[in-house]
Amino acid sequence: MARSMSLKLACVVVLCLLVDAPLAQGAISYDQVKSSLLPCVGYVRGNNARPAPPNYCKGIRSLKSAARIRLDRQAACKCIKSLAADISDINYGVAAGLPGQCNVHIPYKISPSIDCKRVK
């Protein structure tokens, strides 16, 4: 009888942990990141000293607000890194400066060597 009760209690505890556990994958999708940053592609290919146009900042701000938890920020980082690798002639200095021009703080620098697992 005690063993049966212990087993039931263990099952309830496991179920509670599963229900309360965060999803293993962030809520941010690759397509969401891509569509938010697509207007910026031409800008990050050049040596742009001029301020970023407002529509670029809108996409960056929407990504920032969508990345509320660490897993989302890591997922966004991975997507940004993947997108940047696919853009020919990307100027990483311009890309890294874009969030700052938009007054958006992200917890990492956009670069090909970023370790997205370390993003907090």
From Swiss-Prot:
Keyword terms, alphabetized: Disulfide bond, Lipid-binding, Signal, Transport
Which terms does the record give in the GO molecular function aspect?
Answer: lipid binding
Q: Which InterPro entries match?
A: Bifun_inhib/LTP/seed_sf (IPR036312), Bifunc_inhib/LTP/seed_store (IPR016140), Plant_nsLTP (IPR000528)
**A Pfam short name:** Tryp_alpha_amyl
Tissue specificity field? Specifically expressed in fiber cells.
**What residue range is the signal peptide?**
1-26
Q: Which cysteines are joined by disulfide bonds?
A: C57-C102, C77-C116
Instruction: Enumerate the transmembrane spans.
Output: none
Give the family from UniProt. Belongs to the plant LTP family.
| Task of the protein | Plant non-specific lipid-transfer proteins transfer phospholipids as well as galactolipids across membranes. May play a role in wax or cutin deposition in the cell walls of expanding epidermal cells and certain secretory tissues.
> What is the recorded name of this protein?
Non-specific lipid-transfer protein 6
- Where is the organism placed in the taxonomic lineage, from the top? Eukaryota, Viridiplantae, Streptophyta, Embryophyta, Tracheophyta
